[in-house]
Amino acid sequence: MRILLTNDDGIHAEGLAVLERIARKLSDDVWVVAPETDQSGLAHSLTLSEPLRLRQIDARHFALRGTPTDCVIMGVRHVLPGAPNLVLSGVNSGANMADDVTYSGTVAGAMEGTLLGVRAIALSQEYEYAGDRRIVPWETAEAHAPELIGRLMEAGWPEGVLLNLNFPNCAPEEVKGVRVTAQGKLSHDARLDERRDGRGFPYFWLHFGRGKAPVADDSDIAAIRSGCISVTPLHLDLTAHKVRAELGAALGVEA
């Protein structure tokens, strides 16, 4: 099985090293094409206004000045000697759940693999803070992902669907199981933090607050909060089919 790895945290990210160890438990034919720099939050964006610069690190490790989407295209269309059987994207530092999947470069890497006709999985690891220090239990994803991915590959899933895996913030032995979940809903609270530089000119940092919102029992959020691994199937068809029919009826046209 040939596996292509990418991420959005960049070629030097610890989560990418974790992902490679996971992949090597599944196959010896593992390739890495990852961004030169952090591409978090760039979602499914492409680089169209400047050239893509590819740097070969060794026989199977490449860094690209581009987005996760660019990396998957480069891997499938140029770097690999043949089509991969699986694209793995991650392991992201922090969960990618609910509405956040629309911003996620990690999920986008798997999305692009799916668009190219390759089975694809995004992996993210929840974490916590101790003071100002981020504590990421990478060992949890590393311990549980290989067997879970193997089982998922054996079971298979439809074309046009990618799988979004999130691992809870706990030790490997404290994981309480696996749940197949729905994409949850977060309270969206985007904020701008305005500051001044040394010359007095304004600049801004974008950040997100988290308001309280009901959490559905079958959601990815509920699974992670309960200490379970969340497996969420996501499809590329964004059509709201029920609303399509309703709009057709309201307009008196075929839908």
Curated annotation (Swiss-Prot):
Its cofactor is a divalent metal cation. The keyword Cytoplasm applies. It is found in: Cytoplasm. HAMAP family: SurE (MF_00060). It catalyses: a ribonucleoside 5'-phosphate + H2O = a ribonucleoside + phosphate. Belongs to the SurE nucleotidase family. Keywords: Cytoplasm, Hydrolase, Metal-binding, Nucleotide-binding. A divalent metal cation binds at residues 8-9, 40, 92. Its EC number is 3.1.3.5. This is 5'-nucleotidase SurE. Disulfide bonds: none annotated. It is an enzyme of class 3 (hydrolase). It comes from Brucella suis (strain ATCC 23445 / NCTC 10510). Nucleotidase that shows phosphatase activity on nucleoside 5'-monophosphates. SUPFAM superfamilies: SurE-like.
